Amino acid sequence: MGRKIMVVTAAYGAEQVRQAGGQRAMLPVIAGAGADGVEIRRELFNSEELLALPALSESIELMGLLACYSAPAALFMPDGTLNPDLPRYLSEANTLNALWLKVSLGHFSDTQPLDALRALLNASGMALVVENDQTDCGQLAPMRRFQAACREMALPVTLTFDMGNWLWVGDSPEEAAHHLAPAVSYIHVKAAVPHKDNFRAVAPDRADARWLDLLGQLPADAPRGIEFPLEGADLTAVTRHYVNLLREE
């Protein structure tokens, strides 16, 4: 079947997901579009849904989908220590039978906490991927420092490469791909176009060829996650269009 295509539930918009009945209600759309899996977003859960992860995991499996789990949290706190909530997020990812947990980098300063991180990951058995976010901590320089430290310490932590986020922090996506591609295990696909004083995310076929070209700089076998807005009267058809596009590109 080739590379795996994941659909990020947030691509449908938080309000749309809420009105549909939560992330579980989006699974038939995602499965019906022919996607391989779903990225579940912790920030889209209400308190009751967060307690119902086993049922969500069962639904994902029944739909024949893979899962990954995204927590809106930084790996490192402002003082450089590991996020104390990381064990909880790893446990939730395990409950979902997720392939990996995704977090942002946060305030990485030195390698001292990495041995503790290794122990946590060994204990949980969960893979961890770190994403470049839209904060200063997600700039290319700190991401390179972290990736180099992981390589030096043989720490099994890889990167999520969010194609569009580099523009939000003033970096070149192409330069980032040049430096980070070997460590990338997951790609958040989205294009970004100027909007007022900033940028907004759009589908890659609604922007210039730069974005699809950028995919060519990244590992061909890395799963691709659809994170640009998915909108329209027939969400299954819209999703299917982009699943097919990203599988072929």
Where are these regions (language model features)?
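Histidine-acidic metal/acid-base catalytic patches
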Residues: 1-34, 97, 140-161, 167-249
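N-terminal pre-domain/capping segments
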Residues: 1-87, 94, 249
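Short secondary-structure transition/capping segments
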Residues: 50-53, 80-82, 113-116, 141-143, ...
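Active-site beta-loop-alpha junctions enriched in small/polar residues
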Residues: 10-14, 41-45, 70-76, 106-108, ...
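Active-site acidic/histidine proton-transfer and metal-coordination neighborhood
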Residues: 62-67, 75-158, 168
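Hydrophobic residues within beta-strands of alpha/beta enzymes
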Residues: 38-39, 101-103, 128, 187, ...
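Short, electropositive alpha-helical surface patch
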Residues: 56-67, 120-127, 220-221, 236-249
